[in-house]
Amino acid sequence: MADEIWDVYDVNRRRTGKTVIREQSWGFEKYHLIVHVCVFHPDGRMLIQKRAHEKKAWADLWEVSAGGSALAGEDSWQAAEREVFEELGLKLDLKDVRPHLSVNYERGFDDFYCVIRDVDLNQLVLQKEEVAEVRWATQQEVQQMEREHTFVPYFSGLIDFLWQIRDNYDGAICQGSRATEV
């Protein structure tokens, strides 16, 4: 597998023109961009994935539908499209779709996209190096996983907030965006 190369951002989320190789120590005041895609079923459940056993971070834990680091030259939406396709084999058109939530964290910026799709799990093509399995889960099931420490420990309350976004903006997510399967 080729080394991942990331753009380096400043504290104000501007690309610095520099890049860094993943796993390379790169100092303070340098940030990178990661993305997550939350696929919700029309009935309100979220598609979640179990991270592969071989993953360095959070192996064997459940997490949101897809996510990862933006590669050098990618905008947020491009990284989101690529990650969901690589990990799940699901094509989405997120061009001109703003992230529904952006979180600043110690090492960078994390953009969350929420889409509503009735996805047939049997049609997904899982990236074995990243994803062990997928399933639909209710908010209560994910909350239980968080209590049992079987779900990636995102910021406190973040997962519940994603459901609030889904519940309060589902018209915009469903019809007002171009986040459709292609």
Predicted regions and their residues:
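A short coil-to-beta-strand element that immediately follows conserved catalytic motifs
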Residues: 91-100
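A residue-level structural signature of the nucleotidyltransferase/glycosyltransferase Rossmann-like core
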Residues: 6, 45-46, 134
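Conserved Nudix-box catalytic region and its N-terminal flanking loop in Nudix hydrolases
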Residues: 23-35, 41, 45-82, 86
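Short loop segments at secondary-structure junctions
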Residues: 12, 41-44, 52, 116-121, ...
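A broad structural signal for alpha-helix termini and local helix breaks/kinks
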Residues: 88-92, 117
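Nudix hydrolase/Nudix homology domain
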Residues: 60, 72, 101-108, 112-182
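Acidic, metal-coordinating catalytic segment for phosphate/diphosphate chemistry
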Residues: 1-36, 42
